[in-house]
Amino acid sequence: MMDLVLEEDVTVPGTLSGCSGLVPSVPDDLDGINPNAGLGNGLLPNVSEETVSPTRARNMKDFENQITELKKENFNLKLRIYFLEERMQQEFHGPTEHIYKTNIELKVEVESLKRELQEREQLLIKASKAVESLAEAGGSEIQRVKEDARKKVQQVEDLLTKRILLLEKDVTAAQAELEKAFAGTETEKALRLRLESKLSEMKKMHEGDLAMALVLDEKDRLIEELKLSLKSKEALIQCLKEEKSQMACPDENVSSGELRGLCAAPREEKERETEAAQMEHQKERNSFEERIQALEEDLREKEREIATEKKNSLKRDKAIQGLTMALKSKEKKVEELNSEIEKLSAAFAKAREALQKAQTQEFQGSEDYETALSGKEALSAALRSQNLTKSTENHRLRRSIKKITQELSDLQQERERLEKDLEEAHREKSKGDCTIRDLRNEVEKLRNEVNEREKAMENRYKSLLSESNKKLHNQEQVIKHLTESTNQKDVLLQKFNEKDLEVIQQNCYLMAAEDLELRSEGLITEKCSSQQPPGSKTIFSKEKKQSSDYEELIQVLKKEQDIYTHLVKSLQESDSINNLQAELNKIFALRKQLEQDVLSYQNLRKTLEEQISEIRRREEESFSLYSDQTSYLSICLEENNRFQVEHFSQEELKKKVSDLIQLVKELYTDNQHLKKTIFDLSCMGFQGNGFPDRLASTEQTELLASKEDEDTIKIGEDDEINFLSDQHLQQSNEIMKDLSKGGCKNGYLRHTESKISDCDGAHAPGCLEEGAFINLLAPLFNEKATLLLESRPDLLKVVRELLLGQLFLTEQEVSGEHLDGKTEKTPKQKGELVHFVQTNSFSKPHDELKLSCEAQLVKAGEVPKVGLKDASVQTVATEGDLLRFKHEATREAWEEKPINTALSAEHRPENLHGVPGWQAALLSLPGITNREAKKSRLPILIKPSRSLGNMYRLPATQEVVTQLQSQILELQGELKEFKTCNKQLHQKLILAEAVMEGRPTPDKTLLNAQPPVGAAYQDSPGEQKGIKTTSSVWRDKEMDSDQQRSYEIDSEICPPDDLASLPSCKENPEDVLSPTSVATYLSSKSQPSAKVSVMGTDQSESINTSNETEYLKQKIHDLETELEGYQNFIFQLQKHSQCSEAIITVLCGTEGAQDGLSKPKNGSDGEEMTFSSLHQVRYVKHVKILGPLAPEMIDSRVLENLKQQLEEQEYKLQKEQNLNMQLFSEIHNLQNKFRDLSPPRYDSLVQSQARELSLQRQQIKDGHGICVISRQHMNTMIKAFEELLQASDVDYCVAEGFQEQLNQCAELLEKLEKLFLNGKSVGVEMNTQNELMERIEEDNLTYQHLLPESPEPSASHALSDYETSEKSFFSRDQKQDNETEKTSVMVNSFSQDLLMEHIQEIRTLRKRLEESIKTNEKLRKQLERQGSEFVQGSTSIFASGSELHSSLTSEIHFLRKQNQALNAMLIKGSRDKQKENDKLRESLSRKTVSLEHLQREYASVKEENERLQKEGSEKERHNQQLIQEVRCSGQELSRVQEEVKLRQQLLSQNDKLLQSLRVELKAYEKLDEEHRRLREASGEGWKGQDPFRDLHSLLMEIQALRLQLERSIETSSTLQSRLKEQLARGAEKAQEGALTLAVQAVSIPEVPLQPDKHDGDKYPMESDNSFDLFDSSQAVTPKSVSETPPLSGNDTDSLSCDSGSSATSTPCVSRLVTGHHLWASKNGRHVLGLIEDYEALLKQISQGQRLLAEMDIQTQEAPSSTSQELGTKGPHPAPLSKFVSSVSTAKLTLEEAYRRLKLLWRVSLPEDGQCPLHCEQIGEMKAEVTKLHKKLFEQEKKLQNTMKLLQLSKRQEKVIFDQLVVTHKILRKARGNLELRPGGAHPGTCSPSRPGS
């Protein structure tokens, strides 16, 4: 087929298009395909018009040749069509079977997948049912909890109502105080005027005092001159005297006397005058000085008063300013209303005049003119009255509106108070939770202590047992020694016959007997008291009592040993036999009483053990039930931080179960919602043309509304697209702005609770919260992380706990750091503070969520008005822009109003009157509240306000501080004015750019609609007031957040009543540190880590506490967490640099053309805000580093801070002025350029590229700012760490490693900063710019490559349009970029190199655009030239008029028509095939999409199956662990019981030993009796050997008993050792069961009661062979009686435990009751056994009772028989032997009864749904797992079948497509063959259509 296509066909015309010679130089197409095929130009040869030359006429031969050629071509064409159809049929018949097979397989796979899906849904339904059944179990507990909660809520409501009443009273009092303050301001104004007048008078007085001082100086000078003149005159007088003395005159004496008199008189007068003048001058001078001092003091006082008055006047001025502002707003409203009234009156006057004119025209000719005038006057009066009434109604309505707004504000305040009370209740609840945790920890500690004590007691008991064994051994040796001594003393007894010694010894023994009686009585009482039942005490106290009883038993044994020594001594005398007999009777009675007490004690202990075991069993059953439920659910939910379930109580377990059930339900709903969203997305993927935009919008809206109903998501697609694209536009500009605010951190916690409640297209603020949260995380995380956080609330819980834990750590560190110069806190106060902070931090997030939701729903109505008022200057083009403004306004209002407005301005000074920091903050408030709302959203002056607040506490000079403060306020006012001016200029610039770029004019209706909205907003003063108050509160909170720590510390000095107000200030979320949100962490206002690190060093130097090491460890831990946060931040920055391009493309892709209109405004505003936020953050950091210095430096530092603030304010002013000048120049330039430019068309591709450039530049700037901040913070942290190392003893290696990590972080941050700043290294910015340049170059290269080859004129025109639009847009965009670059150079000190690179880039782009325009012009000219050549008239053709010629032409026309019809058929067939191909392609794409969907579902099903398998395995493992624990506890219980049994055996053995000793004593007593009888007889020697024989038999019996006792002790010790070995090995359950069966199978021999035929050798005893039964093969319990084989002789021998011959003993087989051995448990409350065993036991007990009664009778008859025997002096040994035999028979009966008792089993009967519950659960789980396996296998089969079917269908479609392609090529070839060769008939003529012509 390809040969037909590729071979050269002669019939094909030379030109590509139908026009001949349009493009002469274009080469032929390689494949021979005509680009204009199907257009109708080259399908038919126009022979009559094109092939014949116009100069030559056509003859008949030509016509005949033409006809024959046409016939041939027609025939060939038909043949080809026929063969083609046959070939197609053959090709289609071939591979159909394979296609059918694949189709069938695919169908099978689809069915299997459907089945699997159905089965999985059924499994999910089963799981939900199981969870609901579990939930029903805890229903009663939930109801109880609900009732308790209702009661608590009722109490809280009562409290809240009381507090509301109190607060209303406070409000009235505050209003009264306000009025008083208002009156006080007027009086203070008057006082200030008076003081100013007084000041002027004082100044005048001061000037008079200066004049007086000048006069005094002149007088002093005159006095000095007079003194000088006096001195000169005295010198003259002296000279005259000397001359006169030299003269010799007779009358010398007379003249000298006269001269002296004459000289003395004036001298004295002058001296007097001078002295008087001096005194006067001195007095005057003193008086003047005193007056000057008094005046100076008055001046100082006046100045002080003036300073205070200035301060007060400033405050009053501010208050007056606020009031005047309010009055101005009211006056404006009044003026507006007056203007409206005037307009209405003017309109009314005009209407009245019009009416009068009309009526005068009507009634000019009538006589009733005057009556009509009077009627009109009445009408006008009525209208006036109506107008008056309406105006009064308007006033009344305004008043009612004001009242309603006031009531609304009051209600909001009450709601906030209620929420505060709810927070307090939550805090109390969190306190209760903390106490519960503490109690749980204490319980665990107590358990550990109890276990340790049990171990200690076990060790003690073991030591006591070993000691008692040793003592028993010693006692046995002593007894043997005593028996030997008795034998020796029997011989010695015959020698002692002296009576005196007997009497003395008798007296001694009587005394000893009395003592022994007293002792035995004391022992009995002690024994009885010690053996009283312990009652309902714990096991621990019982074990203590057992140990004490054991010690008392040992003491009793010692005392009895002493008694036996006394008895041995007493045997030396023969006369003391009677006394010994009496004593033995008493001892026997005491022994009997003791045995009874021992039996009662054992019974009581058994009952107590049974009760305790029953209680434990019940607890373990309920405990295991709840623990199974909780562990199953916790395994299913994969909870990370769960406690061990074993330590929970029942209430906690029930609570846990209910919580987990709730979680499961929520997860199930989430799963359903996600399924819905996936299905909707898959459905929406095929709708409309805007597929990617809609997909992105629907994904985000449905993921935001994943937990909402379906009704709330029915929002218009256009609104969604506009909103989301605007969100994307604002995203990059709002990142830093959102990061610099603390409220955005709460968005992390709030966004899960937000709701989309507006169904008309305008979303509620909750959606914006989530949008803000996604914007926060957008630079750091990719989109999947945010979606995962939204869909998983448990992850959010974990993050919130981490954040709260970090907050708790930082607050714990910060608490107490401002106490350097104050008194130290006591540890108790510290603990209270820490607990207080903890409760606040625990209770905060939940309440904040509620506050955020409610507050924003309340504010939803008023906020869009604010946004429209703010944006009233801008041009709004479309409805989408209006929506964007709405949402922007809501976002800004949300940022401006803090959601947790816990600090109200009214209650702060009342609650915190003792805290100086609060007062300072409130004093400095009015300076900040004057800032305007738009720019004050960036908290620029937070730290200055803090320094002002601190100023009032420090002893700085008041004058300097007030001056600096006034200067700061002036600068703030100027800055505010400049900012408003700057914003107006920005708006003008944006308008000019919009007009220059040819934007559409804004809708007049929208522009006209804005002022009424503003007016409506102004009509509601309550709302405006609410906004103002919230903004001021926000500013207060911004200022107070930095002083939080000092307030916390000062609050501890205050009384505890003030502490209740502290939670409101602690609810500031800005102290939260999180390593996951590092960007928020860096740009947050309060950087606690730096303050902690610097202030912590001061604290470590000044405060030396006991827990210094813990403090240092805590600091190191905090530094490590901070380092981790920085490392995460660097990693996220790197990740962000990689993801930035993708994010930008997504942003540009979702943007529409109308959204691009508002971009420059947003961009400029965002840049301004980010730059100012960066500067603010740097300044905040600087002040925070300077903050925590030593107290000596604070005075100077405050002044320095204020000066620095002044400098920064001046710098900002200068910067604003420069920006304003620059903007003026830019506006002027734009207005000049606007005249020359016309609005051209723009292309979206160029816009997106320019937008990418601006966004990347903005991101580079933002990244540079973040790097600067983080580097500064890292440097401060390194310094703080060095100071900490110097101040404390930290491990050197750890500190060095930590310091190296810090240095590495700092170096990395410096590198990043250089990279962002310079851009010379291979950084993010250069990469993005280079990629952009390469992309543009590639586009231009392809364009230039396509220029010579473009065949159509439309393409060149489009390209020229594109190039011109590109040029015009780039010129505009580069101007914008130049402007943004200039602003960035001014604000952020960007590098000059980067600017030059941008300018160079712009120049190159302009050059290339100019070149492209030139090439477009050339192409246009060429096309015009070709068009002119094309329009040439075709030459006329000669027509012949012959009939032959006409017939030939008609035949030619007929053939031509036939040809055309055939061609049309071919074209139609090709079109049909094309349509079929398109349909097949569409069906194939649908099938591929469905296949992908099925594959995804299959993968999800597979994952779910794997998860279920994992959960099943984990549950099985957990069950095995529980079984193992139960087994271990059972082993422990069995071990304890075995020990108890061993101790009981030891006690019984001790009793037996005592009994044997008493029997020996009785024997010795009998011997004494016999000796006495013989002595009393006539001395004939020994008569008869019967008593001695009896004694001999008795002794033999005693020895046999002793041997038996020793063997029993040995067997018990071996049993104990083997039990310990078995328990130590931890053998399996079968072996343990075998051991218990074997232990129960060991039985005491069943001996028939034959008291007369007893022998010592035939006495039954336990042998060591009894422990051969521990073979596990023999210990298998038989299942039924029929299956138990009869025992052989060997078995009976091995089971019988007789040491002698087994003739008298019957075999004892361990019998299990049929079918009920599974119920056997050691904690059972029931006994199970055979009725034969029970009857035999009853028989043995009755026999024992009868024997005991006989023995009682014998003991009562014993003393009387002794007296009779003394009288008769005859031997009567019969009663003694009878008593001994009865004792042995009683012993045998007791042993037999004990053996019978062992044959009964303790069982726990199966209750309904209790016994096989666990097994049934495991069985159900296994069945479910197997079902799941089967379903999964079937689904996999289905999927495979569907895959095969789809592959088959793909192959079919491919085959069809290939066939169609082949047919298309054949048809094209056929068409070429049908065309004529004009050069064949006339080789001489040359066709103009050939390329050679």
Curated annotation (Swiss-Prot):
Biased composition, class Polar residues, residue ranges: 1663-1706, 1754-1766
Entry-linked Pfam families: CC_CDK5RAP2 (PF23246), Cnn_1N (PF07989)
Chain intervals for the UniProt region annotation (CM1 motif): 51-94
GO cellular component assignments: cell junction; centrosome; ciliary basal body; cytoplasm; cytoskeleton; cytosol; extracellular exosome; Golgi apparatus
Region (Interaction with MAPRE1): 926-1208
Comp. bias regions, Basic and acidic residues: 1034-1048, 1364-1381, 1500-1519, 1651-1661
Spans annotated as Interaction with PCNT and AKAP9: 1726-1893
Record-linked PANTHER family: CDK5 REGULATORY SUBUNIT-ASSOCIATED PROTEIN 2
UniProt protein name: CDK5 regulatory subunit-associated protein 2
